[in-house]
Regions:
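Acceptor-substrate binding/catalytic loop of class I
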Residues: 181-197
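A short glycine-rich, Lys/Arg-flanked "PGG" loop and its adjoining helix->strand segment in the class I
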Residues: 136-151
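A C-terminal cap/extension of S-adenosyl-L-methionine-dependent methyltransferases
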Residues: 211-268
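Class I SAM-dependent methyltransferase SAM/SAH-binding core
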Residues: 64-110
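A short acidic, Gly/Pro-enriched loop at the edge of an enzyme's catalytic core
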Residues: 109-121
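Conserved class I S-adenosyl-L-methionine
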Residues: 2-52, 54-61, 66, 70, 151-177
Length: 268
């Protein structure tokens, strides 16, 4: 399959796939891998919302609104943005009892907000990674709409991930690509980042690093054929996985390795 490389084509491709996934997307948390991710998301959302409880908060790439509704419980006003219209439909239903939440279907390379109006924003999942042709544009937009001393918390995929051992084609791509390489999930490409590359991005956009949380440090040693199964399908393994996940959650606070990193920064 030939993947799109023009940013507009990439956006349309990603939107179409997420539209098609909408009905089953909420079940993704039932998979072993994502169960660990969502635990970290909940902790990070609570920390960001508590640090900036007033003003406008954005959830970029909000999907079906799982993080949006958590923000809404603590933030003054929340706007969720997603490129998929069907995901936005689900998010509206989830948050219909929250009067301080609204949604916009749009592209995060062109945020429809004035300069310096946002107190805090999230971009979890492959929101930045899917925009692999426009990473600098996305960061520039996020910085533009953020208030001075506003918080930005976003997730990026790590280049060197243990699961590459199970995927020789992707391992070869990583070895032969300078900096982050492209990987694929559900027919969509996403960019990975080296630590140096990420650090340089923050410096380029004038952002001050506050915190880094690594996710799935140990769990990526589990073969993908098991890691991406639903927990109900492997109840015996789930007991073992719970122990690994607890250890992962602890290690992720100190180690800068794992499948992805959640980076929290402040605009000076």
């Amino acid at each position: 399959m030939t993947s799109p490389t023009d940013q507009r084509e990439v956006g349309s491709h990603v939107a179409a796939i997420y539209d098609a996934m909408q009905a089953e997307y909420d079940r993704i948390e039932d998979e072993f891998y994502f169960a660990s991710c969502y635990q970290v998301y909940r902790e990070c959302v609570a920390a960001i919302a508590s640090a900036r409880p007033d003003g406008l908060a954005l959830d970029l790439g909000c999907g079906t609104g799982k993080q949006t509704i958590l923000l809404a419980r603590r933030a003054g006003r929340v706007i969720g943005i997603d490129i998929s219209e069907r995901m936005i439909e689900s998010a509206r239903k989830r948050c219909e009892a929250s009067p301080n939440v609204s949604f916009v279907c749009g592209d995060i390379t062109r945020l429809p907000f004035e300069d310096g109006c946002v107190e805090a924003m999230l971009a979890y999942g492959d929101v930045i990674g899917h925009n692999f042709t426009a990473v600098d544009v996305v960061l520039k937009e996020m910085v533009r709409v953020c208030k001075p001393r506003g918080l930005i918390s976003f997730e990026v995929d790590s280049k060197w991930c243990p699961d590459l051992l199970y995927l020789p084609g992707e391992l070869w791509s990583a070895l032969t690509t300078r900096g982050g390489h492209l990987r694929e999930w559900k027919g969509m490409q996403f960019k990975t980042f080296t630590w140096r590359e990420l650090r340089d991005l923050l410096r380029t956009h004038g952002l001050r690093l506050l915190d880094v949380r690594s996710m799935n440090v140990l769990t990526m040693l589990i073969p993908p054929s098991l890691l991406f199964r639903r927990r109900e399908e492997a109840p015996r393994f789930d007991v073992f996985f719970q122990k690994v996940m607890k250890l992962d959650l602890a290690l992720g606070r100190f180690l800068r390795c794992g499948s992805t990193r959640i980076v929290t920064v402040e605009k000076p």
